[in-house]
């Protein structure tokens, strides 16, 4: 985000679960000035009436971030900030048949975070999946949270111009 002029991020709850993003002069609160998407699918609660993004994808799984601003963003929705698309990894960047990745963190106030991913390529098929478990008691009263996220995708490259794919996502948060 440091290379995109006028974009700023804001993390409001001390947990890193919900990241707010905005462009210059607009509110970053829950990214409500952006049309927020994941792999092209809208992930805000109500894109036209109440466009807050309560969910932010795990940043370890994000391959790239697509931002469309100005008049071109109108094709994605009415938000003033434009469109923000989190494009998750799909395994096409992994040159091995299988690769396993894990990141685990423990800290004060009962913090525990475990991110585990598997991905790879087998001929014309590439796949990627992850599971993230994040919990803490919080640094203040009533700050407890527990988040579980699972994602998997499988893609088959039929030809250089045609790819067939499947993806499944599950997110559960208690706070």
Regions found by a protein language model. Name each.
Residues 106-135, 140-175:
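Transmembrane beta-barrel wall of Gram-negative outer-membrane proteins
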Residues 41-69:
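Short acidic/polar hinge/loop motifs at secondary-structure boundaries
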Residues 2-45, 63:
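Extracytoplasmic beta-strand/coil segments of soluble accessory domains associated
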Residues 18, 52, 79-81, 97, ...:
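Transmembrane beta-barrel architecture of outer-membrane proteins
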Residues 8-10, 31, 43-45, 71-75, ...:
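Short beta-strands and strand-coil junctions in structured, solvent-facing domains, enriched
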Residues 64, 71-74, 82-120, 131, ...:
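Short strand-turn segments of transmembrane beta-barrel domains in outer membranes
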């Amino acid at each position: 985000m440091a290379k995109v002029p006028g974009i700023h991020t804001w993390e409001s709850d001390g947990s890193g679960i919900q990241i707010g993003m905005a462009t210059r002069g607009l509110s970053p609160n829950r990214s409500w000035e952006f049309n927020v998407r994941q792999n092209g699918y809208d992930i805000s609660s109500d894109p036209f009436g109440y466009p807050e993004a309560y969910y932010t994808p795990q940043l370890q799984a994000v391959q790239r971030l697509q931002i469309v601003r100005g008049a071109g963003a109108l094709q994605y929705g009415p938000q003033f900030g434009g469109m923000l698309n989190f494009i998750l990894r799909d395994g096409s960047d992994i040159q091995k048949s299988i690769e396993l990745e894990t990141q685990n963190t423990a800290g004060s106030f009962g913090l525990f975070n475990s991110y585990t991913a598997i991905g790879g390529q087998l001929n014309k098929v590439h796949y990627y999946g992850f599971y993230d478990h994040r919990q803490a008691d919080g640094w203040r009263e009533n700050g407890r949270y527990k988040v579980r996220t699972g994602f998997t995708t499988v893609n088959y490259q039929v030809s250089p111009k045609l790819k067939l794919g499947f993806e499944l996502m599950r997110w559960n948060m208690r706070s």
